[in-house]
A protein has these predicted regions:
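C-terminal soluble interaction/assembly domains
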Residues: 217-225, 229-302
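Stable alpha-helical elements in mature extracytoplasmic
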Residues: 30, 40-44, 50, 85, ...
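A short, structured surface patch at a secondary-structure boundary
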Residues: 15-21, 27-90, 96-103
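Short, small-residue-biased leader/transition segments that mark boundaries at the very start
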Residues: 1-13
Length: 316
């Protein structure tokens, strides 16, 4: 799908910046009242010191950000796609609604156009580079008229990330093989070797065990193939909702005799989950790729990292 929008800096006159013949919406970069439809948008605005601009969200109970929770009585929860409370959305008088479109254009588009409410897609979900995802905070700094703050906030992240990546690469430690995920129905979805999670595993000194998928999306494999992969893996990561080995045993009983399960080398990215089940990994990790990398290095090569894991925990 194609989205047409033009973002102009708040210090410039709009008519001087819009390309001739441009017919899309024009966003002036000085948003003060923002409705964020994804928790990653909240994390990005928080990273650049602009979380107070958020006046509306989607699914407030599942959001981990402490500022949003502290202000929850004054923040509108507009609901989810397919069941948006447009009356509430209008009452929030937003300068901008931030959208995402993982499966195509948002169903909110046409209604927002009808209501003359400015909107913009934040494309972090299209990025496979961990640093590329985080850099979208700079785009949101432009939206809020704080470009310099955004660039400064982002600049330190690749420095820390690449320093740790180099430390791992310069070491003479082994390369543990890593299995990912749990079944969904009768299939087991395995990410591409070029995916966000596979890149993090490689940069942390691990070896993603499924090298067949070199495309641009996860692909399903059958449970038999998944069992063979898990049997060869040194470690098993990102195991759904499991909080313990017993949880994993209940959902994947046939996998309890795999080496990684028997050795207790099973780790999940749900160490920061709130009472409603909202997982901060899917919120703030997008702006903290260096911390996610550090967690994985701690798991693969604990002698290289002193800090304890933030997003990951070992299942007991």
């Amino acid at each position: 799908y194609e989205i047409s929008a033009c973002l102009v800096g708040s210090e410039m006159c709009i008519r001087d910046r819009v390309p001739e013949g441009f017919a899309g919406q024009v966003l002036k970069g000085d948003a003060k009242r923002i409705v964020a439809m994804s928790s990653t948008h909240i994390a990005m605005l928080d990273a650049i010191g602009e979380v107070r601009c958020i006046t509306g969200v989607s699914g407030i109970d599942y959001i981990s950000n402490p500022d949003i929770q502290a202000r929850r009585d004054s923040i509108g929860d507009v609901g989810y796609e397919g069941n948006i409370n447009y009356e509430l959305l209008l009452s929030l008088d937003p300068d901008l609604v931030l959208l995402y479109g993982v499966n195509g254009a948002s169903a909110m588009e046409s209604k927002l156009e009808e209501l003359d409410i400015p909107f913009m897609y934040v494309g972090d979900y299209l990025e496979e580079s961990p640093l590329g995802k985080a850099e979208w905070m700079v785009v949101l700094s432009e939206v809020t008229g704080k470009r310099e703050k955004g660039e400064k906030a982002f600049a330190a992240i690749p420095v820390r990330y690449n320093a740790l990546k180099k430390k791992v690469a310069d070491s003479t430690l082994g390369t543990p093989s890593v299995m990912l995920n749990v079944p969904y129905g009768d299939s087991w979805f395995m990410p591409s070797t070029q995916s966000y999670v596979a890149r993090l595993i490689t940069d942390a000194g691990g070896r993603y065990i499924y090298q067949k998928n070199t495309g641009n999306a996860s692909i399903p494999i059958d449970l038999e193939e998944a069992y063979l992969l898990a049997s060869d893996a040194d470690m098993w990561l990102n195991v759904g909702m499991a909080n313990s080995l017993d949880d994993l045993k209940a959902s994947c009983p046939k996998f309890t005799d795999t080496r990684c399960f028997k050795n207790g080398e099973v780790y999940n990215n749900n160490a920061r989950t709130n009472t409603a089940g909202g997982n901060d990994y899917y919120e703030s990790a997008v702006v903290n790729p260096d911390i996610v990398l550090r967690d994985l290095v701690k798991i693969f090569h604990p002698e290289l990292v002193q800090e304890e894991c933030v997003y990951y925990k070992q299942l007991k």
